[in-house]
């Protein structure tokens, strides 16, 4: 028995095949503990937020079309291309504090669910992942 495929179904199948071949820019991220960086596995990082305790800090990176795939957590303002007009007040640097818990959220892609990554710093300042999404 042969199935009849109408034009709409054929178009849908072609779109799905093209979408799977090209891929999409998602918000999937992981953490590189040695280099203290957040790495985007899919797409670029443009907008992100870091939550520390009950305070959220929002960041926007410079660029028109392409941005960076990593965010250096050692000093976010000085080691990344942060948009100057998007700084918080007179804050010149943003560094991670020892013995603190953080949530990094990639909010770059509008139609994708924001991806969050939880990590903490120990007393020496080393990073540790709380949800085991570590880059290899």
For each feature predicted by the language model, list its residue ranges.
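Sec-dependent bacterial lipoprotein signal peptides
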Residues: 1-24
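Short linear sequence elements within intrinsically disordered, low-complexity coil regions
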Residues: 18, 53, 64, 107, ...
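N-terminal non-catalytic regions of secreted/periplasmic and cell-surface proteins
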Residues: 23-60, 114-136
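N-terminal, post-signal-peptide region of Sec/Tat-exported proteins
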Residues: 52-82
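Signal that preferentially marks extracellular ectodomain short beta-strand elements
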Residues: 71-101
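Extracellular recognition modules
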Residues: 103-105
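Short acidic/polar inter-strand loop motif in beta-rich domains
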Residues: 107-115
């Amino acid at each position: 028995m042969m199935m009849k495929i109408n034009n709409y179904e054929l178009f849908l199948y072609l779109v799905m095949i093209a979408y799977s071949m090209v891929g999409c820019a998602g918000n999937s991220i992981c953490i590189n503990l040695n280099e203290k960086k957040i790495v985007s596995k899919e797409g670029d990082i443009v907008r992100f937020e870091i939550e520390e305790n009950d305070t959220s800090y929002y960041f926007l990176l410079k660029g028109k079309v392409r941005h960076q795939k990593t965010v250096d957590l050692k000093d976010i303002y000085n080691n990344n291309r942060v948009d100057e007009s998007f700084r918080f007040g007179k804050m010149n640097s943003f560094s991670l504090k020892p013995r603190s818990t953080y949530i990094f959220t990639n909010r770059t892609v509008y139609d994708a669910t924001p991806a969050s990554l939880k990590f903490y710093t120990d007393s020496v300042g080393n990073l540790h992942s709380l949800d085991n999404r570590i880059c290899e």
